[in-house]
């Protein structure tokens, strides 16, 4: 098994606490409203805390698909949220697990910087596919910007 680590940052005009609330606390409600392709977010196991497994159902290529997302840690005081993709179409056959460690920090002019460390654990001696990695980054960036756009369009959300 190989472990490959990548880091990325995204900036937002939305304040960290407000963005965190939308991305973590109210995610099950906000994400389907903000991200056009996501149909639903539902808890399939757990109580919403660490260990909880959520099912994100979305449309891709005209088909309904899903990904299973396991909450690893929630750190509201430090605006941190860690989760893993543990099943569904987001987990290719060569990948054991994809983990995300996220944190929001103060950015310029009252905005935020979203920092993420992605760890890909492969099965056997498989290597991560570079094109899949680029596509995953593009999806993550689009997701982050969709939430930002939703919050900008709904200034009363708190």
Curated annotation (Swiss-Prot):
Gene Ontology molecular function, alphabetical: abscisic acid binding; calcium ion binding; cytokinin binding; melatonin binding; protein phosphatase inhibitor activity; RNA nuclease activity; signaling receptor activity
Annotated localization: Cytoplasm, Cytosol
GO cellular component: cytosol; nucleus
Binding-site residues, Ca(2+): 32, 35, 38
Binding site for trans-zeatin 2: 60
Matches recorded under InterPro entries: Bet_v_I/MLP, Bet_v_I_allergen, Plant_def-hormone_signal, START-like_dom_sf
Family from the record: Belongs to the BetVI family.
Protein name according to UniProt: Class 10 plant pathogenesis-related protein 2C
Species the sequence originates in: Lupinus luteus
